[in-house]
Amino acid sequence: MASSTATVSLHNLVKLCCKRNSTSKVFVSLYNQLEEKSPIQDNDYLSNLLQPDIKNKSKRESSLITEYILALAISSESQLEKFWKFLPEILLENQIHYMIELNSILLSKSNIERPSSDIFKEIVNNCFFKYTSSYISSLFPGISATQVSLLNHIIVVWCSVIRRSPFHLNTSSFKQLAVKIVSVLTECDLRNSLNYFISNTSSILNTDDLQVDSVQDSDDKKIAAIRSTTTIQLVNNISSINPKSRKATQLNVIKRYLWLNSIMKNWKFSNDVFLKQFEQNFLPNSSNNLKKPYVLAFELICAFFKGIVTSICSNESKYVLFNWKNFIITRLPTLLNDIKFTTSHVAPTSNDSSFKQETLDDAIINAFESFEDPVNKVLTQFSIDNLSICDLRQTFIKSCIYNKLIPVMSYHKIFTADNTVTDQFLNNGIEQVGQITSIRDEFETKLLNINTEFTTLEDSGLIEYINSLPGLLEFSATKQLELSETVDQVIEHLIDEKNIEKLYRLLLSVCNNLTTLNLICFNSNCGPFSILYKLINYIDNEDFNVDDDDNFQETYAFFGIIILAILLIIETFKIDYSQITVTNSYIVDYINEFYYRLCDSLTNISTSDTEEDNTIISNYNDLISDWINALFDDNNDGLSDDLIKSVNVKQIYKMIPIIYQQSIIATNSNKIDIKILNNGIDYLSQMFLIPCTLNIIKWLLRRIWADDPTLDCLPVQVLHELIKSNMGESDEPTSESKLFFQIVLKISGNSIISTLKKLNNWENSNLIKDIIEKVSNSVDPMYLENDLSIKLNERVNLYEQLKTNVINLVNNMNIYDYQFLNIFSSIDRDNELIRYIVEEITSYQKTNGGNEDTKLFINLSIFMILLDAIDNDDDKQYWIKRIKDTMVPVSSNSSGENRFDISMDYHYSSIFNNSDETSNNDYLFSGENNNSSVEIEGLKRKIGRHESLLNSFNKIKEFCDTEVQSTFVKSLRTFRDKLINELEVFTLNV
């Protein structure tokens, strides 16, 4: 081994370690062995380690080499000296790379461990200190972008040192260096960098320090620097809240809840750093706590159980409540399992008896005992659907036992008075959870491997199996994940195989059980969007032509179930596509024009007057007349196969709502009688036309208020007839067509019930009572929404109401109604919250920092803004850049600036002239598909950023750099600096 090592060069060592993906520890060890045999020359060190030729290296190799050299550098003082000696000799771009990795090491975000205390001190007080001093001495006004970038990264490293390890820093020496940095930043007019540096060094620098030689070249720049320091002091005052005060504790609880609720709303359950984020943001002092595992477990349990109670009291959407419940039952035990309770966390010499409370059982018991009466009342009688009731605490403990987190005997240790649950019952539960069969096998048996010609949907057992899943998988996180993965894979497989009949069976079964659908979405990495985008892309890329297919009505029905599945997901999970238009996307156009806007944007006026266009329009008018006669004329033979096949199914789904709207209007005008209208409505019970009833129902509900809203007005009569013709009598067996229409009612049911119950004395109408009964029986009780609206005081400023709400919550720990905070971003139509916060900062200045409530309101409001705006690290970096940018945004005079779309002419002929058909043919030849989901996701991101409250800051941030010295401008600068500070350290969701 020794002889072979002697022949190994540094070049080969680096190459071998990269190939094997060796850790930095392994590399350092091998490097030291190599250097013992033969000293490594400086040129070899430079060319193979410090600045290797990266042209022929992958990104992974380059990253590994960076780790290797830095790990080597901090392994000893001699290696450290060597690294910093040669670092200034390499390209600036490479130096930037090392600064980034060095900062990651300091923030413990690198694969390399933080250096020892002695090495760390040597870096910051000697090596990095000299490197910085030498570099800034070489700078002058007009420096290049690369030089600025390196300077900024050097500043970032220093700021990380100050925030994380100020006690290692020689403060007096650093002050001298900091003054030079401020001077260079001022001379080079790098205002954003200057503000950032001063704001992060305010604990070390003061106004007097800044006046020492730093800005002597310019009185204006000196004033600007001092003004910045004054602003920073105000930021610090606003941010400084006594962490031990009761109000600070309650503020932390509110922030914690808002974050957890956003997770439940936005499907962020698969966050691998959840525990780390929870601890860093809401338990800042736990790292030094001898009882850290106990404290973390206790706070987690309190946060989730009080959180779900708060969401119930805040009238959250039903899917959000389900997500809370399912997280508590399946994910919370997993999180608690990741908290290791060991004897190392006990202080045996302490006389404090509380140190004995270090087991998970103790954390659970003490958390439950800490709940206030209002919390216990909700938990012990827990129900989402107002029908099935359980004690959520007991359900959670059962899950912990079934998943072997705690032993069976813990149940009666926690619930000493409960004699209804025996040890045998709990052992049976453990056995049942462990014996759940393969989800994939069940789908193979009940769907994928059957012959649909010989096995009906009912005989396949698929519906019964889908309905059994919520109860079967209630306590098994792994099986729930398997379910989501299986359904996702099956849908993708069936779409690839174009097996639309089996896709129809799957969607019909799943969409008739919203709890199963919610369960699938909960355990998907992308929430509901994984399934949703697959269906959207399929609709947009498949033409669904039937040609001579004798079963064309089935094909049309299969198309309809996909449309309904998309709309069901959108409605159930509160997804808003009303501001999105995608080029050549049939489904997005359909959702917007025929579902949201109910054909309001359409007109029968042509935008062209050529003979050819007029002929086409005339032919289409004749075709529509044929459909009207077939649907509503008693003397006609009804809808013939030839007539149905004369129009593509995509066109039918746009045409039918218009025809029926006009027929209802004609009936209301006495142009046709109700009998003729009812004859036409009977056709809507045909499977392939059932999905069209959804648009008609939505239109009828709106029409109730457009007409005279009497109890038995025409829209109510039509709605009743429509439901009766599709549902039949309640004692009839459930057919596929009935299941089909039940999906329509699951989508529209909440709107139907809430609209009809707003009519005066609705209880006196037999028609309305019959409608509500049929709808209530079809909609899953768990997803029958309460009235989600909130009553606002029109006479009080919206932002004053928010402030009052926040102060009440901070001052009263027994208030659990957070609805106003939860929905504030959706009701703040004017996006004026930022202006109001600036006014509050002004008010705070006038009281000389004496108003604690104002300070708390400012902090919580900014937290709410960031939580709403930042969904990932890309968002965070985007907003940091935008807010630091002093460029005035270009304003738009377009009336459609709040909507990202492509203009098009809306007229009836557009129903037939679908632009997506031509594009789909192009894709057939090119072998590519129209990926609408990618475009939708991109537009969602743009719209989210455009509508973010942070975006409204762009309208006023230009005043930050004005020379006017007003209280408002000072407040605005303070807000900007506070915002930047909060953004820099914001780690939630990223």
From Swiss-Prot:
A GO MF label: transcription coregulator activity
Short name of any one Pfam family annotated for the protein: Med5
Task of the protein: Component of the Mediator complex, a coactivator involved in the regulated transcription of nearly all RNA polymerase II-dependent genes. Mediator functions as a bridge to convey information from gene-specific regulatory proteins to the basal RNA polymerase II transcription machinery. Mediator is recruited to promoters by direct interactions with regulatory proteins and serves as a scaffold for the assembly of a functional preinitiation complex with RNA polymerase II and the general transcription factors.
Subunit (UniProt): Component of the Mediator complex.
Parts forming coiled coils: none
The protein, known as: Mediator of RNA polymerase II transcription subunit 5
Organism: Debaryomyces hansenii (strain ATCC 36239 / CBS 767 / BCRC 21394 / JCM 1990 / NBRC 0083 / IGC 2968) (Yeast)
Swiss-Prot/TrEMBL GO biological process terms: regulation of transcription by RNA polymerase II
Membership in a protein family: Belongs to the Mediator complex subunit 5 family.
Record's subcellular location: Nucleus
Entry keyword annotation includes Transcription: yes
Recorded GO CC terms: mediator complex
Keywords tagged on the record: Activator, Nucleus, Transcription, Transcription regulation
